[in-house]
């Protein structure tokens, strides 16, 4: 197998997500010849030239926070050729509870050669696609158990409605916990705002992977003596930051750069304008929309 092809694809995915700064873990696999043969032999009539196997390459992205799923999905759909008709994106209903899927199918890059990793006898029924599943860290373990002990053993669960519902109920509990987690960090951010701990307020409000910058201390000290500006920072919408990051080249993410973005977008504070590097202003002007 040509592992370099797979690693290059994963690097492209990571660069796309890293540009947003969101917290995540990534897992991936390439179906082995044995696994591929097993899948085909299990139902020989299922796959043909009109219905091909689309998950030769499988990727899972487990996000720390549930509100980042749509943000990452949109970024990936901009980066790769998305195939909506083959993807599964569930909309939860109020009447029932069950796992919601966000299984996305994309075209493989033109540089990716299926023939290098698939035996000639199978190539006609392998699509030049990869499947990417978006999940949360809290739901990841549940999905693993579900896949190995329910999906792969469907016969063991036939007629066991009570047990199926109870198992789905575990997922519902995790889903509730995910929203509770978001609320907790909102409250943490507010507490630090009231205590004028600007750095902690930002870390808990943004929930992004931030790196230190030599301008951070200067910016934080400036904010501490400008209480009205602190209030504006606290009220600034996190989704707006993610939108700006997703429509521009990758930027080193630091507390100071995030504040500079807020300022050029909304505050137009003279003191912050004086501190803002020209490189960041050029970055701001490079929006793709």
Question: In which residue ranges do the predicted regions lie?
Answer:
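Generic alpha-helical secondary structure
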Residues: 2-10, 66-69, 73
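Short low-complexity stretches enriched in small and charged residues
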Residues: 11-22, 56-63, 86-90
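Short acidic, glycine/proline-enriched loop segments that cap or flank alpha-helices
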Residues: 49, 120, 229-233
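A generic structural signal for short, solvent-exposed coil/turn residues
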Residues: 18-20, 53, 96, 124
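Surface-exposed, low-hydrophobicity interaction/linker segments
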Residues: 4-43, 254, 271
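Polyanion/phosphate-binding surface patch
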Residues: 25-69
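An acidic, glycine-/histidine-flanked metal-binding catalytic module
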Residues: 2-7, 16, 126-277, 281, ...
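Long beta-strand-rich cores associated with HINT superfamily self-processing modules
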Residues: 62-184
């Amino acid at each position: 197998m040509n592992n370099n092809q797979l690693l290059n694809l994963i690097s492209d995915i990571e660069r796309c997500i890293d540009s947003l700064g969101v917290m995540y873990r990534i897992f991936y696999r390439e179906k082995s010849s044995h696994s591929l043969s097993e899948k085909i032999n299990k139902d020989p009539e299922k796959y043909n030239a009109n219905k091909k196997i689309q998950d030769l390459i499988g990727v899972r992205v487990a996000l720390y926070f549930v509100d980042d799923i749509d943000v990452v999905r949109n970024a990936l759909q901009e980066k790769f050729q998305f195939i909506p008709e083959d993807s599964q994106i569930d909309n939860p209903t109020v009447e029932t509870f069950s796992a919601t899927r966000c299984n996305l199918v994309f075209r493989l890059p033109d540089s990716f050669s299926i023939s290098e990793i698939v035996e000639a006898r199978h190539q006609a029924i392998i699509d030049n696609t990869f499947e990417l599943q978006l999940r949360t860290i809290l739901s990841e373990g549940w999905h693993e158990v579900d896949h190995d002990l329910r999906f792969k053993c469907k016969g063991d669960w036939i007629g066991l409605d009570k047990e199926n519902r109870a198992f789905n109920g575990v997922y519902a509990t995790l889903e509730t916990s995910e929203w509770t987690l978001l609320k907790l960090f909102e409250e943490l951010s507010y507490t630090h705002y009231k205590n004028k701990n600007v750095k902690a307020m930002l870390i808990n409000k943004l929930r992004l992977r931030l790196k230190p910058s030599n301008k951070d201390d200067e910016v934080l000290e400036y904010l501490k003596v400008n209480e009205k500006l602190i209030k504006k920072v606290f009220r600034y919408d996190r989704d707006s930051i993610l939108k700006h990051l997703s429509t521009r080249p990758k930027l080193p993410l630091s507390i100071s750069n995030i504040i500079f973005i807020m300022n050029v977008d909304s505050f137009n504070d003279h003191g912050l304008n004086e501190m803002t590097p020209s490189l960041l202003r050029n970055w701001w002007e490079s929006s793709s929309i």
